[in-house]
Amino acid sequence: MNKTTSSHSPIHVIGGGLAGSEAAWQIAEAGVPVILHEMRGVRGTDAHKTESLAELVCSNSFRSDDATSNAVGVLHAEMRLAGSLIMRCADLNQVPAGGALAVDREGFAEAVSAAIADHPLITVLREEIRGLPPKDWDLAIIATGPLTAPDLAEAIRAETGADALAFFDAIAPIVHADTIDMDICWHQSRYDKVGPGGTGKDYINCPLTQEQYDAFVDALIAGDKAGFKEWEGTPYFDGCLPIEVMAERGRETLRHGPMKPMGLTNAHNPSVKPYAVVQLRQDNALGTLYNMVGFQTKLKYGAQGEVFRMIPGLQNAEFARLGGLHRNTYINSPTLLDHSLTLKSRPGLRFAGQITGCEGYVESASIGLLAGRFAAAERKGVSPVLPPVTTAFGALLDHITGGHIVSDDEPGKRSFQPMNINFGLFPPLEPGALTRPEGAKRFRGKEKALAKKQAMASRALSDCASWLDQAV
């Protein structure tokens, strides 16, 4: 079909997955022409099976659709408010999945592909882009996802630096800070070391007796483990071994590795030396999330909850993210990108989707949505208006572009790791925002936690609507 002309020069989007498709749609809906470059049809990947745009490689679930008390459900709702193509096509191709939003994967991808093909301001070119965009592409978005082709990945590495591009996630679980039992745990850095920006009390420490340690090691070794996808290979290297692999190398390995007790004194029982210690380190600037240091794992999710709650102090832990180790090409976004997702070293070039370090279908699409809106605003000569950090959009964007705390003692060379949306990324509620429901006999525990989530969700949707009224 003939494409409608526009007075604006086109914006180029590289990658026709969830993020790239959403970015292209948002740009076009803003009245700016866009050229979407997708290599499938010319060159396939090890995971994709079709040439459709927005093909779902793994699950067909977009997870919870509850916008009243679930962070991903809030993100769904915000995307719908913003006119998301991905959410529109998901809703049109929904299949029964309880409280979750799951889709017919073929119908979904076909719907996205058709909408993109039919839009008068979008042109799809089936070609592989082997390097960074040429200089005459003054505005471009790279949204090539976790399976970025080798030539482009190498070009990104050359532009950003040798340590700025990761090809595998070594993900340790992340715990909501308010679910850690501080009657058992205590704050202390090893040897009370202060370090850059530290206080000497930068870690939460969980003590284990020998009996508890032995039981924990046995459970780790016996735990149900996930295998690698055929196309992932087995990327173990010593700086980033799964915790259960370390345990299998010898019963004392963990005590002399990530669970070593040296330099730590139990504040609750100073005269008794712990046999082993699990350390958790602050993961976000808000201090609402803590990651389990050195606990990258291939245990299946169900096993992780059972095994890690054996650790004293984590018996009631709620996890913002569980651990994993898998193929996932992504950049060190907090260092490389500004808050509008633009590469600091190259104005006009944005990154979007999973390559920025977000995790999950809707998270990737939402960052594509933001990148598309920001690029369209820039094309129109308007400064992008950032979403408030109180929204799901803003909380995720803030984590990617600067909310993560960088640490020098992370296993391997990186500390920024991909993250799903969760309420731990949102700023705390204002004092007094939670009040006891009228007639309620108690307001603590699960009731208070639910009320907190509901208040955060309500605030997010209200602030998102206000932001959309301002944004171009």
Swiss-Prot record:
FAD binds at G15, G16, G17, L18, A19, G20. PROSITE patterns: GIDA_2. Catalyzes the folate-dependent formation of 5-methyl-uridine at position 54 (M-5-U54) in all tRNAs. This is Methylenetetrahydrofolate--tRNA-(uracil-5-)-methyltransferase TrmFO. GO terms for cellular component: cytosol. InterPro entries: FAD/NAD-bd_sf, MnmG-rel, MnmG-rel_CS, MnmG_N, TrmFO. One of its GO terms (molecular function) is tRNA (uracil(54)-C5)-methyltransferase activity, 5,10-methylenetetrahydrofolate-dependent. Its EC number is 2.1.1.74. It catalyses: uridine(54) in tRNA + (6R)-5,10-methylene-5,6,7,8-tetrahydrofolate + NADH + H(+) = 5-methyluridine(54) in tRNA + (6S)-5,6,7,8-tetrahydrofolate + NAD(+); uridine(54) in tRNA + (6R)-5,10-methylene-5,6,7,8-tetrahydrofolate + NADPH + H(+) = 5-methyluridine(54) in tRNA + (6S)-5,6,7,8-tetrahydrofolate + NADP(+). Its cofactor is FAD. SUPFAM superfamilies: FAD/NAD(P)-binding domain.
